[in-house]
Amino acid sequence: MIQVISDVLTPDELKRFRELLGQAQWQDGRATAGHVAVRAKANEQLSHEDSLGQQLSEFLLERLGKISHFIAAALPLKVLPPRFNRYTGGGSYGDHIDNAIFSVPGAGVRIRGDLSATLFLSEPGDYDGGELIIQGEFARHQFKLPAGQMILYPASTFHQVTPVTRGARLAAFFWTQSLVREHSRRALLFELDNTIQALAQDNPEQPAVARLTGLYHNLLREWSET
C-alpha cells in the first residue's frame, strides 16, 4: 500500500525549512548506508547530532502526530526521528531496500522499519531528475511530489532516487514501526477505517457504523503488537 499524504507543511513552513537547510552543514550520505547500499548511494545528509536537524526533526514529529491520514495508514507504534537529505550535481540512490532495524540516536531504543516515508521539501520545478521510483507488486511507480507532500510506502520494497541533474532536491525521510507488522493486514484496516468514516459522515446513527467500528477494533486487537 502506497499513500500520498498532502499538506504536511504549510507554504510558510516550507520556506523556513528551505532557508534553514540552505545554511546547514551537509555530510556525505554514504556514512549512514549499509555495506551493500553504500555502493548505490550518492547524496548528502545532515548528521544525527546536527542541532538544526534535531530542531526540524522535532517539529516534524509533532506535526505527524496530528495528521489523521498518516496515523490511519501507518498505525504508528514508534517513529524514527526524521532525517534530511540533499541531492545535487548528479546525486542519486540506486535500487535498494532499507535496513530492517534502526537505532534511535541517544535513546538506546531500536525500531523495526515497517514503513518508509519521504517528505518533499523542494518544488518539482526547482530540480531535474530526482524521481522516487518504488517497485510495486505489479509495476514500478514514479513520484516527484509538490513540496509539502509525503509518500508513505512499505520499507520492504525496492526503490531508488534518479540522478538530479539540475538544482537541488531537499527532503525529509524517516521510518515507522507499525502496530500491525503485516502490510496486507494494515491495508485492510485502512480500507475498513475509510469505509467507517464515509458511512458515519452520511448517517452516523446507522447500526452498521457501530458494528464495523467494533470489527475494526477487534481486528486491531487481534493483529497489533505493542
From Swiss-Prot:
One biological-process term from Gene Ontology? Answer: intracellular iron ion homeostasis
Cofactor: how bound: Binds 1 Fe(2+) ion per subunit.
> Which ranges carry the Fe2OG dioxygenase domain?
78-178
Q: Which GO terms describe its molecular function?
A: 2-oxoglutarate-dependent dioxygenase activity; iron ion binding; L-ascorbic acid binding
- Name under which the protein is recorded: PKHD-type hydroxylase Nwi_0701
Give me the residues that bind 2-oxoglutarate, please. 169
The record's section on SMART domains has: P4Hc
Residues annotated to bind Fe cation: 96, 98, 159
In terms of Pfam families, this protein maps to: 2OG-FeII_Oxy_3, PKHD_C
Give the enzyme's main class according to its UniProt record, as a single word: oxidoreductase
Entry keyword annotation includes Glycoprotein: no
Q: Which cofactors are required for activity?
A: Fe(2+); L-ascorbate
Q: Which UniProt keywords apply?
A: Dioxygenase, Iron, Metal-binding, Oxidoreductase, Vitamin C
Q: Which InterPro entries is this protein grouped with?
A: Oxoglu/Fe-dep_dioxygenase_dom (IPR005123), PKHD_C (IPR041097), PKHD_hydroxylase (IPR023550), Pro_4_hyd_alph (IPR006620), Pro_4_hyd_alph_FE2OG_OXY (IPR044862)
Concerning NCBIfam families, the annotation shows: PRK05467.1-3, PRK05467.1-4
Q: What's the EC number here?
A: 1.14.11.-
